Amino acid sequence: MSPATVLDSILEGVRADVAAREASVSLSEIKAAAAAAPPPLDVMAALREPGIGVIAEVKRASPSAGALATIADPAKLAQAYQDGGARIVSVVTEQRRFQGSLDDLDAVRASVSIPVLRKDFVVQPYQIHEARAHGADMLLLIVAALEQSVLVSMLDRTESLGMIALVEVHTEQEADRALKAGAKVIGVNARDLMTLDVDRDCFARIAPGLPSSVIRIAESGVRGTADLLAYAGAGADAVLVGEGLVTSGDPRAAVADLVTAGTHPSCPKPAR
């Protein structure tokens, strides 16, 4: 038997955690909570604003880097991101490897007026209703974690609740699967979740094969304006930034620098 990948071990823990939450709050109860939540915000409008958008992430830790930052007040951090000009705030809610929680999602949703992305390893329909119940407007779906039929059904369910799916890929083959599933927003993660290795040329290789109708988001590897401009030159509509912001010392200023670069007249524009 081949050794489990990093992704396999993460998913094993996620499935156990979802089962525990569902034992406490049933699927019917979480569906009712989702139905009662305020309607989701318009993610596509936010992503289609002029310039290269910044999705700023509340992220305490990662499997590759370990602990990143002590975030005592995720609401305050999210407000700083919004004040800096972020289009969307991403909240990592996976607890074992990333030290996130649904409490973080609740706090962020209550503190900002821009769309919120729930970033987790979604493997059960329960998590989709859970995301909506806790105020998410957007939800991460990772192609590598889902068989094709499941990806299609998860994407359909996400959109049926009024949310937008950020469909994450790392290879050209995964990008093809995302397109066949009907993804409107595709994120290219430079990090291979099987090994945690980083391929910084990943976005530039995959983006040209995506139709212009698809919103393209570059994930991982943005440390400053030079990285944003490089991704913009390769066709990105937005960048998702986590580690570079939570370790910056001044998250509002760090976001503002990226936003300024992304909206500068000299910044490359996506082909539309």
From Swiss-Prot:
Pathway: Amino-acid biosynthesis; L-tryptophan biosynthesis; L-tryptophan from chorismate: step 4/5
Assigned EC number: 4.1.1.48
Catalytic reactions on record: 1-(2-carboxyphenylamino)-1-deoxy-D-ribulose 5-phosphate + H(+) = (1S,2R)-1-C-(indol-3-yl)glycerol 3-phosphate + CO2 + H2O
The name this protein goes by in its record: Indole-3-glycerol phosphate synthase
Top-level EC class as recorded in UniProt: lyase
Gene that specifies this protein: trpC
Family: Belongs to the TrpC family.
GO terms, biological process: L-tryptophan biosynthetic process
Organism, scientific name: Mycobacterium tuberculosis (strain CDC 1551 / Oshkosh)
Transmembrane segments: none
Pfam families named among the record's database cross-references: IGPS
Domain of life: Bacteria
Any one Gene Ontology molecular-function term assigned to this protein's record: phosphoribosylanthranilate isomerase activity
SUPFAM superfamilies hit by this protein: Ribulose-phoshate binding barrel
Key words, A-Z: Amino-acid biosynthesis, Aromatic amino acid biosynthesis, Decarboxylase, Lyase, Tryptophan biosynthesis
